Regions:
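Non-catalytic, mostly N-terminal accessory regions of nucleic-acid modification and defense proteins
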Residues: 1-206, 210-211, 215, 273-282, ...
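Conserved Class I SAM-dependent methyltransferase catalytic core
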Residues: 13, 20, 29-42, 327-401
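Tryptophan-centered motif/residue detector
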Residues: 15, 28, 258, 307-308, ...
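A structure-centric signal for secondary-structure junctions around beta-strands
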Residues: 34, 175, 218, 245, ...
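Extracellular loop and loop/strand-boundary signature of outer-membrane beta-barrel proteins
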Residues: 104, 325-327
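Conserved S-adenosyl-L-methionine
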Residues: 193-299, 304-306, 311-315, 320-324, ...
Length: 401
């Protein structure tokens, strides 16, 4: 079977399983269990592959936990960013999932142990809270412990049945592609709320290519409203990973989506030391401003959202907004994101940002910001996209480069 055919069959199967295991629960409300279980399987196989190191005589899943020395644990955690004992591996939990009366508490303990394994290590920020949305006590799983365990077992056995082939032979990001396929389907079925965290693949491909056009390499790439990380990862898919020297950076305001983005990085085999996703409000509490500027910025920020704007008199003196001499309107933060991105660009950098069309013709403060951008020769082009490309909205949008 070709890799492409394998991927297509895998995606068809995984969506069927995702719908079967959720029962009467809305897919949007159940997504964290399917996505989280897929992630759990991936990091288990990724970690096993690292420990075994291609030695066919080593079977990590069959080892007793007590053979793991502190030195082994320390070395593995420094390299991978986390540690998983053999008994905690997905494959070993899946074996007895249907007959484990303590499945929900076992999973909670394992997820807590995986997160805690990074405490005190450089990866702590990247691992902490990854499983926070995988609530094994949630009533969405059922009203009783038995019902919860049956639903959890169904999810685990469903994910176990997926054929990803040998982990070390996986050349086309099958895990990552499956994860993004699920996210896109959940977004499409959720309607408007889906667009908050996922940019359709055809649009994200264009944005990634625009931001990196003509550049043989970039120091790093950044998304100030990164959602689930799909835009950042398109840059990885469109260009060899070595062209992005220092990795992938993003900030996300929604806690659940922030966790999805971090999982997405791992699932696309980006090691913890090659990405940094921050949680918080980009406009009011920006991260990375003290670091080296970015050669490439991609973003699909929320359209015309409210922000504090002129209600905070200190913002007009913010290095990001002061050069324009005016703040974006309180009811339309679009240009605040644009000015933020501009201030984070290196001298040779380029940003490609999806924008609501209104910012290109409305008067007032937005007109003044447009004049600043044009007079400063900061605008390379504006590309008009057709309608109905984005989940939950039929409006046409533009890409500002």
């Amino acid at each position: 079977m070709t890799s492409i055919k394998q991927r297509d069959e895998l995606q068809s199967t995984i969506w069927k399983i995702a719908n079967e295991v959720r029962g009467a629960v809305d897919g949007w409300d159940f997504k964290q269990f399917v996505l989280g279980t897929l992630f759990y399987r991936f990091i288990s196989e990724n970690f096993t592959n690292f420990i075994e190191g291609g030695d066919e005589s080593v079977n990590y899943a069959n080892m007793p936990d007590d053979v793991i020395t502190p030195e082994i644990k320390d070395d593995a955690t420094r390299t991978k960013g986390y540690f998983i004992y053999p008994a905690q591996l997905f494959v070993n939990i899946a074996k007895n999932a249907n007959n484990n009366p303590n499945l929900n508490t076992d999973l909670a303990a394992i997820f807590d142990a995986i997160e805690s394994s990074a405490n005190g290590y450089p990866s702590e920020h990247d691992i902490k809270g990854l499983f926070a949305d995988f609530d094994t006590t949630s009533n969405r799983l059922g009203n009783t412990v038995e019902e919860k365990n049956r639903r959890l077992a169904a999810v685990i056995k469903g994910v176990e049945s997926l054929d990803f082939g040998n982990f070390e032979d996986n050349e086309i990001d099958l895990f990552g592609d499956a994860y993004e396929f699920l996210i896109s389907n959940y977004a499409a079925n959720a309607g408007k709320s889906g667009g908050e965290f996922f940019t359709p693949q055809n649009v994200s491909k264009l944005i990634a290519r625009l931001a990196m056009s003509g550049l043989a390499s970039v120091n790093k790439i950044y998304d100030p409203a990164c959602g689930s990380g799909s835009l950042l990862l398109q840059a990885k898919k469109q260009f060899d990973a070595h062209l992005i020297e220092d990795g992938f950076f993003g900030q996300e305001i929604n806690h659940t989506t922030y966790n999805l983005a971090r999982m997405n990085m791992f699932l696309h085999n980006i090691n913890y030391d090659k990405f940094d996703i921050a949680l918080g409000n980009t406009l009011l509490n920006p991260q990375y401003g003290d670091e080296k500027p970015f050669d490439a910025i991609v973003s699909n920020p929320p359209y015309s959202v409210n922000w504090v704007g002129s209600d905070d008199p200190t913002l007009i003196n913010d290095d990001r907004f002061a050069p324009a001499g005016v703040l974006a309107p309180k009811s339309k933060a679009d240009f605040a994101f644009v000015l933020h991105a501009l201030s984070y660009l290196s001298a040779r950098g380029r940003a490609a940002i999806v924008c609501f069309p209104g910012i290109f013709y409305r008067g007032g403060a937005e007109q003044k910001i447009r004049k600043y951008l044009v007079d400063g020769n900061f605008v390379e082009t504006v590309i008009a996209l057709p309608p109905n490309l984005f989940y939950g909205t039929g409006i046409s949008v533009n890409i500002l480069v």
